[in-house]
Regions:
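N-terminal accessory nucleic-acid engagement/regulatory domains that precede
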Residues: 1-89
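Conserved pre-motif I regulatory segment
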Residues: 48-55, 82, 86-141
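Post-DEXD/H (motif II) to motif III coupling segment of the RecA-like Helicase ATP-binding lobe
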Residues: 70, 235-236, 241-307
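Walker A/P-loop
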Residues: 120, 134-159
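Conserved interdomain hinge at the start of the Helicase C-terminal
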Residues: 155-156, 318-357, 361-368
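Conserved nucleic-acid-binding Ia/Ib motif block in the N-terminal RecA-like helicase ATPase lobe
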Residues: 160-217, 374
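Conserved helicase ATPase core of P-loop NTP-dependent helicases/translocases
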Residues: 176, 188-200, 216, 353-355, ...
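Conserved helix/coil segment N-terminal to the catalytic DExD/H
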Residues: 194-236, 247-256
Length: 403
């Protein structure tokens, strides 16, 4: 029987030595996944790319989390692993399960639905946290509205003993929202995005875009601080809304820059359906170990039940193509006037959110709805927060937003 050597380079990367080329090729093919829209991309049209994303190099390099697939191929090819060299730093991760009263006498802040009450984790939040503690490298699908920020804060607190934690979120709004929860819980937290670059903190919250920019600037010597220096001492990486990060960028950060972090957890409301996107997350973080659906949260009374009322309008004009019809839908004055009147009537029953996909339509509606706020790309973070706080604290407010 043929044999090979497995070298575990760090927390995510592995390398095989002594494997025949044909076996390496079979493993490479087993870990290649099609990109559905590849045929529209220039590289594919020019014949420079086969339209697939691979997770095992012909040189023998791959990922720890793909070892199941790799060993299956080796078994079928009659190859055994005769030697394993593990170069990972030895870290004794030992966590005890937590209970709902983890935060003791700490209370929810002003503006929270449970303002002034003691912070008590919900049963499903305790379940998610304990699942993570039993699996130091894993992903869980947790629906939006489940309270992921308090879950993240709890995980950061628990892992303080092992070093710094880095929380990666998809946008600036989530940075400040997560920061508020960390501050309320009494954690030593800083943020890194835009013009706010707070260093030397136990816990750092940032966007994946900020890390990517810092990485590029470091390579070209354009930044005083290198990404390696920024990430020094990080032992825990928590990625919120994993599916919103660009697969390749996130994979590079987690498998190269953060390759030695022993604790890596991912939270997402939606597990990517495309295999190549999921495998990038799987390789970087770990397997999916749990799921809390929106339906479960509705059944528990955590999320509101949805009641959909369709307002059918009579549109008589005929349009020759989609773009022409879309232009009519968002710019026709009669139609927009009707929507404005409808919104003014609806807002009497409570706070109202109007989503638009054209700035021009949002501006027209803002003019038609008194005291409404329009949140779009150029609205500063502080102004966005004020708009969100008004919704939290008041009634009959209208927020118009692009999506």
């Amino acid at each position: 029987m043929a044999s090979c050597k497995l070298i575990i380079e760090d927390e995510v990367n592995i390398k095989f030595e002594g494997l025949a080329v044909d076996v390496r090729r079979k493993i490479s093919n087993a870990l290649k996944f099609e990109v559905p829209y590849a045929r529209y991309m220039p590289q594919y049209k020019l014949g420079r790319w086969d339209g697939k994303v691979g997770f095992f190099g012909l040189g023998g390099s791959g990922y720890v989390n793909h070892l199941d697939t790799i060993t299956d191929v080796l078994h079928k090819q009659g190859v055994e692993i005769s030697e394993i060299i593990d170069r990972r730093e030895v870290v004794d991760l030992n966590f005890e399960d937590i209970k709902e009263d983890f935060w003791g006498d700490k209370t929810w802040p002003k503006g929270h639905p449970a303002e002034g009450e003691k912070i008590r984790l919900r049963d499903y939040q305790v379940e998610v946290i304990n699942n993570f503690l039993q699996n130091p490298q894993a992903l869980q699908e947790v629906a939006t509205g489940a309270g992921k920020t308090i879950i993240t804060a709890t995980l950061s607190k628990i892992t303080e003993h092992y070093g710094r934690s880095l929380v990666i979120v998809p946008n600036k709004s989530l940075v400040t929202q997560t920061e508020d929860d960390y501050i309320n819980c009494g954690l030593d937290v800083g943020v890194y995005f835009g013009d706010r670059k707070e260093l030397g903190k136990t816990h750092t919250i940032c966007t994946w875009q900020s890390l990517n920019i810092l990485d590029k600037r470091s390579k070209y010597g354009e930044d005083v601080l290198s990404l390696a220096e920024f990430l020094e001492g990080v032992s825990t990486v928590i990625v919120d809304e994993v599916h919103q990060a660009k697969a390749e960028v996130l994979k590079n950060l987690l498998t190269r820059n953060l390759k030695n972090a022993p604790i890596r957890w991912g939270l997402t409301g939606t597990i990517p359906k495309e295999k190549f996107e999921f495998e990038a997350i799987h390789a970087s973080i770990g397997p999916v170990i749990g799921q809390i659906s929106a339906k479960e949260l509705q059944d528990k009374g955590v999320l509101s039940e949805c009641h959909v009322n369709i307002v059918q309008l009579i549109d008589t004009p005929v349009h020759s193509n989609y773009q022409e019809e879309l232009k009519y839908l968002v710019s026709n004055d009669q139609r927009v006037d009707y929507l404005g009147k409808l919104a003014n009537k609806i807002k009497q029953s409570g706070n109202t959110l109007i989503l638009v996909d054209r700035i021009s339509a949002g501006e027209k509606l803002q003019a038609l709805i008194p005291d409404s706020v329009f949140v779009k790309g150029d609205v500063k973070l502080k102004d966005r927060k004020e708009a969100y706080d008004e919704i939290n604290e008041g009634t009959n407010h209208v927020v118009i937003a692009t999506y």
